[in-house]
Amino acid sequence: MTHMIYPKTYDVIVVGGGHAGTEAALAAARMGAQTLLLTHNIETLGQMSCNPSIGGIGKGHLVRELDALGGAMALATDKSGIQFRRLNASKGAAVRATRAQADRILYKASIREMLENQENLDLFQQAVEDVTLEGERISGVITAMGVEFKARAVVLTAGTFLSGKIHIGLENYEGGRAGDPAAKSLGGRLRELKLPQGRLKTGTPPRIDGRTIDFSQLTEQPGDTPVPVMSVRGNAEMHPRQVSCWITHTNTQTHDIIRSGFDRSPMFTGKIEGVGPRYCPSIEDKINRFADKDSHQIFLEPEGLTTHEYYPNGISTSLPFDIQIALVRSMKGLENAHILRPGYAIEYDYFDPRNLKASLETKTIEGLFFAGQINGTTGYEEAAAQGLLAGANAVQYVRGQDPLLLRREQAYLGVLVDDLITKGLNEPYRMFTSRAEYRLQLREDNADMRLTEDGYKIGLVGEAQWRMFNEKREAVEREIQRLKTTWYTPQKLAEDEQIRVFGQKLSREANLHDLLRRPNLDYAALMTLEGAMPSENLSAEVIEQVEIQVKYQGYIDRQNEEIDSRRDIETLKLPDGIDYGRVKGLSAEVQQKLNQHKPETVGQASRISGVTPAAVALLMVHLKRGFKDAK
């Protein structure tokens, strides 16, 4: 093979053009770093490899956090979303989430446009087969045709491509996804570097030709009106034409067909060694695990406005193709369905995320960052969020500046990273709101309030977004202050007016702020009082923020007290090379776990399985004694 060194040296190289890679490259370039994005195929940049949707419970929170940090996913979704819904709209603010069906072609085009118009970013089409090192530090990568690209930091976002193997029934072949080759050489090279790794599995359902679906037998599921918006930089005018999803169900016949294929299932015959996602199981896994259920709901999701292709959400499978045809046609409305693409499972290498720092830099190779499914996560949103963080921290590393580290009480991205690096995983990791201890702090509506300032400080957030954020923050502060200084007395309001708005008579003088805290009174009703309306025209986002801050103030204050009480533990750093054998009272088991995981802070140590509260207390005593001795 010929070998040449590319004449330009980069600050950051990103390997992979999926959701993690595109966010990583855009983040690094936005911060002013000379960045190269390497992908095996420029035509597949930003491709939605599985389901045509963005967001949902927990995932939508990550998308908003990405957006608050200047990321691309939310804005691309506004430009490509063909159905938007607000989930849990009637529930508490902490679990409300936005979900969108996206037109695959429009989404990919939007991401491609952002990449091609981003300053400081070069694209190059070549598969990466090797990484180069100078001692224990990354120095670049080598592509399939022997071109060596030099860089001071590298972000690997290889998705399911590392030694990927595709399964349909008992047949299997190497591949990164259907139609794309696996990254076999790179996977082998990373194993040579003794990075701890394992095998995981994911899957996708067969795709159906919409012209062969009988929609008259299905239940229609339209989007919300008014149509929600994902990005603070987006608006409803960006949205393309809106369309419906459709609902059908499996039945006992479907389940019998699926069971008849178990003897040819790669999952049940041992052909697949990797562990699949618990919360997005294949249909055969569902039928096996929930044998008492006679039916499962299946959502038929349109793949776009210019295609007849539908994605049947809920029947991911690696069963033989004859079984796939039969199970699809056993469902109402799909009796004559034509399958355009078969479903399949894919096994791939991942690397133990406990070998990562909170910055997503590997502990063993300086300047090498991992993001996305290579870390064992599943989902576009989880990958994109990690990509942005890894890209930003690659730049911070190159500049010799402190990394962007997000705390558990600050962001779902902070929860995600902390879970990965302290607990590891034995199945693909998916984000849920239940994973966060401080859900009330981590709402979709306040993602910008939590993160935009940090993003702006390091160059992730541009001036236009920063200006919009400050206008919103100041409007919220002004309105809350106005509510506190606008008073009503029982004598000021007619008795029937009091009963109409409050449901009862006022017993004493009260300001609008205190009245809004009442559980049966919302902002809109309160503003019907004479003289209550603000003089400025407030956006729906400002009003929502005001209402939530006022109504949940007591709960938020209590959570803040809890967070403050743990701050010492969370932020106290553990010295590099600390000898846990010198910590008096630590058991051999705890010493072993701490030496294995190498946590960076006491907070991280406290979340390692087997590290008890008593062990954490001993660590704190040891560190404080060390600080005193140093003085």
Curated annotation (Swiss-Prot):
Organism of derivation: Neisseria gonorrhoeae (strain ATCC 700825 / FA 1090)
GO biological process: tRNA methylation; tRNA wobble uridine modification
Protein task: NAD-binding protein involved in the addition of a carboxymethylaminomethyl (cmnm) group at the wobble position (U34) of certain tRNAs, forming tRNA-cmnm(5)s(2)U34.
Domain of life (superkingdom): Bacteria
UniProt keyword Flavoprotein present: yes
Name recorded for this polypeptide: tRNA uridine 5-carboxymethylaminomethyl modification enzyme MnmG
Main location as per UniProt: cytoplasm
GO MF terms held by the record: flavin adenine dinucleotide binding
Underlying gene: mnmG
UniProt subcellular location: Cytoplasm
Subunit structure: Homodimer. Heterotetramer of two MnmE and two MnmG subunits.
Disulfide bonds: none
Entry cofactors: FAD
NCBIfam families given in the database record: mnmG_gidA
